[in-house]
C-alpha cells in the first residue's frame, strides 16, 4: 500500500542534514520538511573539499530557493578547487596532479564513448598527466577566469573584446569551511516556509504495525510525526541502524587508517591560496591540506596500530616546522551499512557509510545518494513495504560504495615499504578480489567505463574512468607497451600526438591570461556575476 508523502523529517544537521534539506526543497514542491538538529551535538566535519556535483546545489535556481554563488563564497570563505595534488604516494619527494573533470577542450569519443585516448597517450609516452588546462592552472596557482582586453584569436572564438570570461563549465568544485557552510545552508533552508527547524535530540521512536516509523520522541518530550524519515545523524545512525536489523559491513581488512587529527593553520599576508587539495602521504597515513580564503583546514589521517596520537602530532609538527592545536580526536571505522534504505527511513552522509576522506567521497556521496533517490525513486506516493524497490536502491548504493572503497585502496598500490604501515597497506592481501581482477585486466588492455560497478545511469556517480586513470597514471600502474599497442590498433597514435602538441600550446596561452588565485579572491570575486560563462572547444 502506497504512503502519501506529506511530511519529511530529517534527523541531524551539519553538511549532510542541510544539503539533504536543500535538495528536497529544490526538487520537490509539496512535502513539508522538519529538520531536527541539536546545537549541543558537535559537527564532525573538519573542513571539506567537494566534487563538481556539489556545484549543482549552489548554482541551482528555482522558485523554492536560490543561493547566490558569490554571496556563498564571500560569506563562508570557500575557495575554488580544480583538483588534487598527491605527494609521496608512489615515491617520497614525487607528486602528481589529479584534475577534476575532462579537458576543457571537447573531443569526440572514438572508438567508443569513454575511450580516453588522450590519457592513454600519456601512458604510452611515460608522461605525467599535467597537460590538461586544469593541471597547469593547479601548477601555476591560477583560476579559469580571464579578461579579454585585446584580440586573442587562439582562444577567443567569439571575437569578444573587453569581456570577462568564466570557462569553469563543470570542471571545478569547492573547498569548504564545514562550520560556516553548514550555518550558511541552514539559514537559507529555514527561510523557506515549508521548513521547520527544531533544536532538540531524538531519544526514542514509535513504529507502526508494519515496522515503518510513526513518530520520533524528542528529549523535550515532543512527538514529531512523519511520512518519510532521513537519517543524517552521523556515526550515531539513530534511525537506520538502531531501529532496524541492519549490519555494518567493515572495510578494515582493506583500509588501515582509523583515526583523524584535524587542525587549522591561519593564513598570513603572504600565504598563497592554492586551487587544489593537497594530500601528502606520511609515515603512517596521510595529511590533507584544504585552502580557504582565511585559513587552511588540515588533518592527519593515520592508523593507530602503528602510531599514538601524541607521536602523530609530533610527526606533523616536525614536518611543518610549526606547533599545531588539534581540533579534536576522531576515531572511525571504515565501512558501510548493509541497507541504506529500510522501510520509510533513508540514510545519507556518515549515517550510511564512511571511508577515509581522500577524494571528497563523503560530501559527494551525501549529494549523490539523495539525488539518485530523488531522480529514480521518489514520488508523492511510495510503497515502503515493496521489498524489491528498496532492495534495488540498496544494491545500487552497495555497488557504488564498494567501488569507491576499491578506488581508495588503489592509492596504496605503492612501492613504498619505508614503514610497517606502508608494507601492510600496500600488500596484495589488502585488495579485494574485484580490484585484483581489474588490475589483471588492465595488464592486457586499458581501462574502460564498463569496468566500474558504480556506473549508474545518471549524472551523479562521478568516480569513473577519469579519476581512476589519474591515480593509475600517477601510481605508474599501467603499462606503456599496452597503451602504445592499443593506440596503434585504433590508428590513434599520430592523431593523439598532434592533439597533444596543440593542447600544450593552447593551454600555455590560456594559463597565461588567467588570474592568479590570490588576485582573483582579492579583486575579482566581488565581480563574479559580471563574468560570462563560456565553453571553449
Annotate each predicted stretch with a short phrase:
Residues 163-312, 370:
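Predominantly flavin-linked oxidoreductase catalytic cores and closely associated redox partners
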Residues 376-537:
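Long, low-complexity C-terminal extensions of enzymes
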Residues 25-46:
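Glycine-rich FAD pyrophosphate-binding loop
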Residues 46-148:
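Dinucleotide-binding Rossmann-like beta1-alpha1 core, especially the glycine-rich loop
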Residues 281-333, 353-364, 379-382, 386:
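Conserved FAD/dinucleotide-binding core of flavoprotein oxidoreductases
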Residues 340-358:
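Short FAD-binding loop at a beta-strand-to-alpha-helix junction that anchors the flavin cofactor
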Residues 6-31:
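N-terminal Rossmann-like FAD-binding beta1-loop-alpha1 element of flavoenzymes
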Amino acid at each position: 500500500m502506497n504512503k502519501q508523502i506529506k511530511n519529511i523529517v530529517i534527523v541531524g544537521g551539519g553538511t549532510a542534514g542541510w544539503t539533504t534539506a536543500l535538495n528536497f526543497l529544490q526538487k520537490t514542491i509539496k512535502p513539508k520538511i522538519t529538520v531536527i538538529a541539536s546545537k549541543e551535538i558537535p559537527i564532525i566535519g573538519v573542513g571539506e573539499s567537494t566534487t563538481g556535483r556539489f556545484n549543482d546545489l549552489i548554482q541551482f535556481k528555482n522558485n523554492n530557493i536560490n543561493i547566490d554563488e558569490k554571496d556563498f563564497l564571500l560569506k563562508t570563505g570557500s575557495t575554488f578547487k580544480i583538483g588534487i595534488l598527491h605527494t609521496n604516494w608512489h615515491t617520497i619527494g614525487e607528486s602528481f596532479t589529479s584534475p577534476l573533470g575532462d579537458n576543457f577542450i571537447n573531443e569526440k569519443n572514438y572508438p567508443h564513448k569513454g575511450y580516453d585516448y588522450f590519457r592513454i597517450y600519456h601512458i604510452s609516452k611515460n608522461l605525467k598527466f599535467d597537460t590538461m588546462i586544469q593541471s597547469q592552472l593547479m601548477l601555476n596557482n591560477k583560476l579559469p577566469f580571464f579578461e579579454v582586453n585585446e584580440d586573442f584569436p587562439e582562444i577567443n572564438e567569439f571575437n569578444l573584446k573587453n569581456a570577462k570570461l568564466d570557462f569553469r563549465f563543470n570542471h571545478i568544485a569547492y573547498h569548504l569551511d564545514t562550520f560556516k557552510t553548514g550555518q550558511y545552508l541552514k539559514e537559507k533552508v529555514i527561510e523557506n516556509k515549508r521548513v521547520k527547524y527544531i533544536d532538540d535530540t531524538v531519544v526514542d521512536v514509535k513504529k507502526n504495525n508494519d515496522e515503518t516509523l510513526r513518530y520520533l520522541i524528542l528529549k523535550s518530550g515532543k512527538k514529531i510525526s512523519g511520512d518519510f524519515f532521513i537519517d543524517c545523524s552521523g556515526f550515531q545512525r539513530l534511525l537506520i541502524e538502531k531501529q532496524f536489523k541492519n549490519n555494518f559491513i567493515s572495510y578494515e581488512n582493506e583500509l588501515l587508517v582509523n583515526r583523524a587529527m584535524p587542525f587549522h593553520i591561519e593564513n598570513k599576508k603572504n600565504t598563497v591560496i592554492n586551487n587544489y587539495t593537497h594530500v601528502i602521504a606520511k609515515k603512517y597515513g596521510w595529511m590533507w591540506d584544504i585552502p580557504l580564503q582565511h585559513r587552511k583546514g588540515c588533518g592527519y589521517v593515520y592508523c593507530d596500530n602503528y602510531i599514538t596520537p601524541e607521536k602523530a602530532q609530533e610527526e606533523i609538527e616536525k614536518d611543518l616546522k610549526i606547533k599545531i592545536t588539534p581540533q579534536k580526536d576522531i576515531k572511525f571505522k571504515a565501512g558501510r551499512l548493509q541497507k541504506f534504505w529500510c522501510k520509510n527511513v533513508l540514510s545519507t552522509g556518515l549515517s550510511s557509510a564512511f571511508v577515509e576522506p581522500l577524494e571528497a567521497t563523503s560530501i559527494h556521496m551525501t549529494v549523490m545518494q539523495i539525488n539518485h533517490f530523488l531522480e529514480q525513486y521518489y514520488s508523492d506516493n511510495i510503497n515502503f513495504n515493496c521489498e524489491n524497490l528498496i532492495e534495488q536502491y540498496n544494491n545500487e548504493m552497495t555497488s557504488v560504495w564498494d567501488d569507491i572503497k576499491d578506488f581508495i585502496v588503489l592509492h596504496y598500490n605503492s612501492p613504498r615499504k619505508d614503514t610497517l604501515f606502508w608494507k601492510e597497506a600496500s600488500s596484495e592481501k589488502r585488495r579485494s578480489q574485484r580490484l585484483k581482477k581489474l588490475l589483471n585486466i588492465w595488464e592486457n588492455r586499458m581501462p574502460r567505463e564498463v569496468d566500474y560497478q558504480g556506473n549508474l545511469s545518471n549524472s551523479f556517480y562521478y568516480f569513473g574512468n577519469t579519476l581512476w586513470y589519474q591515480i593509475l597514471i600517477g601510481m605508474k600502474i599501467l603499462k606503456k607497451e599496452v597503451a602504445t599497442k592499443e593506440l596503434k590498433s585504433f590508428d590513434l597514435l599520430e592523431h593523439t600526438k598532434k592533439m597533444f602538441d596543440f593542447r600544450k600550446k593552447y593551454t600555455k596561452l590560456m594559463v597565461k591570461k588567467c588570474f592568479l588565485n590570490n588576485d582573483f579572491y582579492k579583486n575579482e570575486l566581488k565581480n563574479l556575476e559580471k563574468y560570462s560563462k563560456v565553453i571553449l572547444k
